[in-house]
């Protein structure tokens, strides 16, 4: 039996792949499965536009991850019978003033230098693609290969597949792992808020809550929560405002097939605080309105916060622990 701590997209995907090769897994989650960062996520697959100076070593991994998504989505949809809304319309990063335009030119040069294929667009070319974009938008970078997926649909599809395999996958929700018990660097059990579970193999997918587990490492794992506030607006189905993902100053607009429009996300170092704030919502709507003014007429149908698991260098932490 392999124990997986955390039932978000990563934990559930690992469970699915282990089941496929005949392994038995037990998934523990402190809440309901998939109700934290994966539920909050907008589903942007922006491994190209998110490439930054100083992170060049990550580029091959980002590219490999993006290339894996079409096959992953296709297989998951076929097996689960559920749609995950993998969309290939692309993403446009926008500049609305002189300073932003200069910064965007620098970003475009960086992409070109690192052979990340993008297309430079002037304001008129952007408005051909997206007629409702503000006339104040001066320029943009179009990334055809930065796609999106509906993260909540992905969760639903993964849960459907996993729950069909009741003989191989066991789930315990509202079960928080408090401590890992080991002997001579070998895991022997985990202590939860309910009981002690004997186990020899653990896969930790606890995200922002990783460091709340005692004895997970002799040193603090460099993961911290970063809060993001988000809003969902409803577009007119007969006149949807945008087709592509739009992105400016770290704020993005993500259109869904059901005409929802996701506006996100703040980036706040607030520990485990998940409050929605007037300032956070105002910031999102202000930037969004500057990109697409007609947004001000759309009804707000939902809002939420999520806690991203974040590292100092933005790199994922993958691999075996030398302490356990």
Model-derived regions: residue spans:
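Helix-loop-beta segment of a Rossmann-like dinucleotide-binding subdomain
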Residues: 82-95, 107-108, 114-165, 266-271
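N-terminal Rossmann-like FAD-binding beta1-loop-alpha1 element of flavoenzymes
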Residues: 1-27
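Conserved Rossmann-like nucleotide-cofactor binding loop
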Residues: 10, 33, 209
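Helical element adjacent to the flavin cofactor pocket in flavoenzyme catalytic cores
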Residues: 140-201, 205
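Active-site substrate-recognition segment that forms the wall
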Residues: 16-21, 28-30, 43-44, 49, ...
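Short loop/edge segments at beta-strand edges and connector loops
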Residues: 29, 122-123, 173-175, 302-304
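Dinucleotide-binding Rossmann-like beta1-alpha1 core, especially the glycine-rich loop
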Residues: 44-125, 129, 288
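A short, glycine/Asx- and small/polar-enriched loop/turn
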Residues: 99, 130-137, 181-188, 310-314, ...
């Amino acid at each position: 039996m392999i124990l997986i701590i955390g039932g978000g997209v990563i934990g559930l995907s690992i469970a699915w792949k282990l089941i496929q090769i005949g392994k038995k897994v037990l998934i523990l989650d402190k809440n309901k499965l998939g109700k934290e960062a994966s539920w909050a996520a907008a589903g942007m697959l922006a491994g190209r536009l998110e490439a930054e100076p100083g992170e060049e070593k990550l580029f091959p991994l980002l590219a490999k991850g993006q290339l894996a998504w079409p096959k992953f989505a296709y297989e998951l949809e076929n097996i689960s019978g559920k749609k995950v809304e993998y969309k290939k319309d692309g993403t446009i990063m926008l500049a609305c003033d002189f300073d932003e335009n200069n910064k965007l030119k620098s970003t475009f040069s960086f992409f070109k230098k690192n052979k990340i294929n993008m297309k430079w667009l002037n304001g008129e070319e952007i408005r051909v693609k997206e007629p409702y974009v503000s006339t104040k938008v001066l320029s943009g970078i179009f990334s055809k290969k930065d796609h999106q997926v509906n993260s909540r649909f992905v969760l639903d599809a993964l849960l459907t597949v996993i729950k069909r395999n009741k003989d191989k996958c066991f789930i315990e929700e509202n079960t928080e792992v408090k401590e890992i018990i080991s002997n001579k660097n070998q895991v022997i059990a985990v202590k939860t808020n309910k009981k002690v579970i004997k186990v020899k193999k653990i896969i930790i997918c606890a995200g922002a809550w990783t460091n709340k587990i005692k004895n997970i490492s002799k040193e603090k794992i460099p993961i911290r929560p970063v809060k993001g506030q988000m809003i969902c607006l409803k577009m007119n189905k007969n006149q949807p405002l945008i087709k592509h993902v739009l992105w400016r100053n770290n704020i993005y607009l993500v259109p869904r097939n059901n005409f929802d429009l996701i506006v996100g996300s703040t980036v706040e170092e607030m520990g485990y605080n998940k409050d929605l704030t007037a300032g956070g919502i105002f910031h999102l709507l202000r930037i969004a309105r500057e990109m697409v003014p007609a947004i001000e007429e759309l009804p707000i149908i939902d809002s939420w916060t999520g806690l991203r698991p974040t590292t100092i260098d933005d790199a994922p932490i993958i691999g075996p622990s030398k302490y356990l």
